């Protein structure tokens, strides 16, 4: 018989102490008031306005994309309204040499990282040109397999380190993605090799229709970073300043050789999971939606800038009209893009085409010429 222990190891106490360390970081409250002066980022007035312009522009893009999808002019589309601060403020903290590995809802980040809007529309339509990013756009195509981008990001970040680049790789997934095995494998590899990576979990409370409460017993998703020995932080994802500052500091750590960081942004998607038949009213209440609408990242940031005399209705209307004009031009260009063919796809696959495919190529070439 084993000897009776004289004292107990209180595992629950250790867990509670660990979880208590992950308090949500916030700089702006819902009314746009600064609640933590020490954390306010060092952004110029011009930069603050530029970030707001991008958020407004992206909200219009979301509205138009939903409309275009319903008209049959866009294919797959995952709405972004509500997540603008989480997406765009984090991207704003990056440099052009940094790599973005987006999920399927993260097209706005790569647009602002240099991807032409027309190409984003072509990606939605399944046109191969939508995956041929222009030279200098350091990003990969949006990942459809949930969580897979975390492994890829670890590899890209490790490659940047091996090449001595002063750059980072950043990726995004949702709360549901943090339950995937690829999530752990990615952050563990990056941790082990101190790869310059930033792993963003955009916690919008639902993995499609599965609520956050049924996905994990962890009090926060940021604390999952502890398992691989790297920092994790939870921020108010509706607060552009908090998201920006958290990402900026994570980037500084990464390029200094201190390894990756996990950032959990508490956010919300106002629309459906995707435009492929999801109905959020079946799993969300109108009261819940109303509570999160009070936290709208655009409203909050708008109030902050108005109080500083940097924003007004005329300025916003100007951005809205510019967005509509640019979106109209981009979708027209996408409409006029030459229809893809089997041979045009094969042309970009091989430098020297294998004999068996070369024979098939000639067959399709003849068919397409008729």
From Swiss-Prot:
Keyword Cytoplasm in record: no
Broadest EC class assigned to this enzyme: oxidoreductase
Cofactor: thiamine diphosphate
A single MF term (Gene Ontology): pyruvate dehydrogenase (acetyl-transferring) activity
E.C. designation(s): 1.2.4.1
GO biological process: branched-chain amino acid catabolic process
Keyword Oxidoreductase tagged: yes
Catalytic activity field: N(6)-[(R)-lipoyl]-L-lysyl-[protein] + pyruvate + H(+) = N(6)-[(R)-S(8)-acetyldihydrolipoyl]-L-lysyl-[protein] + CO2
Superkingdom of source: Bacteria
Keywords tagged on the record: Oxidoreductase, Pyruvate, Thiamine pyrophosphate
Pfam families: E1_dh
The protein's role, per its UniProt record: The pyruvate dehydrogenase complex catalyzes the overall conversion of pyruvate to acetyl-CoA and CO(2). It contains multiple copies of three enzymatic components: pyruvate dehydrogenase (E1), dihydrolipoamide acetyltransferase (E2) and lipoamide dehydrogenase (E3).
NCBIfam families linked to this entry: PDH_E1_alph_x
Assembly and interaction partners: Heterodimer of an alpha and a beta chain.
Name used for this protein in its record: Pyruvate dehydrogenase E1 component subunit alpha
Organism: Staphylococcus epidermidis (strain ATCC 35984 / DSM 28319 / BCRC 17069 / CCUG 31568 / BM 3577 / RP62A)
Gene that this sequence comes from: pdhA
């Amino acid at each position: 018989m084993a000897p009776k222990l004289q004292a107990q190891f209180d595992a629950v106490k250790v867990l509670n102490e660990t979880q208590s360390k992950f308090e949500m970081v916030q700089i702006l409250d819902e009314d746009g008031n600064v609640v933590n002066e020490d954390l306010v980022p060092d952004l110029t007035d011009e930069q603050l306005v530029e970030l707001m312009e991008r958020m407004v522009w992206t909200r219009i893009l979301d509205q138009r994309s939903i409309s275009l999808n319903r008209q049959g002019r866009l294919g797959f589309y995952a709405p972004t309204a509500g997540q603008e601060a989480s997406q765009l403020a984090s991207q704003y903290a990056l440099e052009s040499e940094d790599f973005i590995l987006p999920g399927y809802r993260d097209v706005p980040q790569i647009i602002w990282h240099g991807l032409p809007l027309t190409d984003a529309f072509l990606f939605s339509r399944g046109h191969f040109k939508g995956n041929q990013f222009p030279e200098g756009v350091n990003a990969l195509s949006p990942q459809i397999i949930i969580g897979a981008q975390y492994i890829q990001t670890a590899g890209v970040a490790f490659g940047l380190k091996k090449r001595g680049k002063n750059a980072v790789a950043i990726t995004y997934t949702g709360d549901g993605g943090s339950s995937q095995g690829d999530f752990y494998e990615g952050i563990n590899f990056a941790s082990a090799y101190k790869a310059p990576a930033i792993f963003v979990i955009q916690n919008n409370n639902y993995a499609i229709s599965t609520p956050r409460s049924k996905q994990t017993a962890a009090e926060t998703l940021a604390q999952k970073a502890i398992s691989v020995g790297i920092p994790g932080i939870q921020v108010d994802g509706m607060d552009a300043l908090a998201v920006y500052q958290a990402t900026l500091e994570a980037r500084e750590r990464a390029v200094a050789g201190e390894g990756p960081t996990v950032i959990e942004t508490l956010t919300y998607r106002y629309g459906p999971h995707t435009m492929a038949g999801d109905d959020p009213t079946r799993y969300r209440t109108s009261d819940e939606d109303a509570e999160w609408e009070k936290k709208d990242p655009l409203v909050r940031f708008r109030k902050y800038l108005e109080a500083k005399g940097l924003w007004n209705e005329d300025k916003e209307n100007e951005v809205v009209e510019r967005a509509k004009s640019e979106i109209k031009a981009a979708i027209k260009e996408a409409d006029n893009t030459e229809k893809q063919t089997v041979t045009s796809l094969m042309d970009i696959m091989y430098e020297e085409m294998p004999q068996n495919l070369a024979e098939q190529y000639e067959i399709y070439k003849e068919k397409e010429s008729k």
